[in-house]
């Protein structure tokens, strides 16, 4: 938003202009899902600009376009740092547990290389264990070399925000509830024509072993 809104509600978006990123992009789809969940019609109750690539929306907002913008980190915190915008809500919090990142492999590869898949999953689980057992400050210092363009204070702010929002699961088990939520969002946006059975697409065998 362009100003601090401690009492923000999704109804505040009615009649406003919002930079949503490209149609079919995950942020835009999650955003529209939340709007509909709150009784807001994305096509009629507000104006969502889908003409700007998601990587350019922060610059457009900073340049004066729209009343609100949907942003990833570190763009959201960067807008706050330059007093160009304020974070007033989180799509992740209001959407429910959306499985935003997933790893896939062919069934033939899974069957032929279970040890490789298990080692890969175990390594990811170590990362999950680390964020569960360390402070945002400690996490920020470890990941800082991967974000050379962002200063440590900003990284710490971002990690703290993710921490408070319960962004990171304690394990890698892809549960059916989250899978169905993802399909709901895709279906709601018109990007999914036919639902896929959870059992046909997801295996939790490796994640369950890694969690123990």
Show which residues each predicted segment covers:
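Residue-level signal for threonine
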Residues: 106, 175, 203-205
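Conserved C-terminal helix/tail region of periplasmic/extracytoplasmic solute-binding proteins
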Residues: 180-212
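A generic structural-conservation signal
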Residues: 22, 44-45, 70, 88, ...
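A conserved helix-loop-strand patch within extracytoplasmic ligand-binding domains
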Residues: 1-65, 73-82, 89, 107, ...
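Pocket-lining segment of extracytoplasmic ligand-binding domains
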Residues: 53-146
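Short, mixed-charge aromatic SLiMs
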Residues: 54-57, 149, 205-210
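Secondary-structure end/capping motifs
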Residues: 111-192
């Amino acid at each position: 938003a362009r100003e601090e809104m401690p009492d923000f509600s999704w109804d505040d978006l009615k009649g406003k202009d919002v930079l949503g990123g490209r149609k079919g992009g995950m942020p835009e789809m999650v955003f529209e899902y939340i709007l509909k969940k709150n009784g807001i019609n994305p096509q009629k109750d507000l104006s969502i600009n889908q003409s700007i690539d998601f990587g350019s929306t922060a610059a457009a907002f900073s340049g004066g376009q729209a009343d609100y913008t949907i942003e990833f980190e570190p763009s959201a915190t960067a807008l706050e740092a330059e007093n160009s915008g304020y974070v007033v809500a989180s799509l992740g919090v209001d959407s429910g547990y959306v499985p935003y990142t997933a790893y896939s492999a062919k069934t033939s590869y899974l069957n032929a290389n279970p040890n490789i898949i298990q080692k890969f999953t175990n390594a990811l689980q170590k990362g999950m264990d680390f964020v569960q057992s360390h402070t945002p400050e400690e996490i920020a210092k470890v990941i800082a070399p991967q974000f050379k363009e962002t200063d440590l204070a900003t990284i710490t702010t971002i990690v703290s925000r993710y921490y408070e929002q319960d962004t990171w699961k304690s394990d890698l088990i892809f549960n059916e509830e989250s899978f169905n939520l993802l399909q709901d969002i895709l279906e709601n946006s018109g990007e999914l024509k036919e639902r896929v059975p959870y059992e046909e697409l997801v295996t939790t065998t490796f994640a369950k072993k890694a969690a123990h």
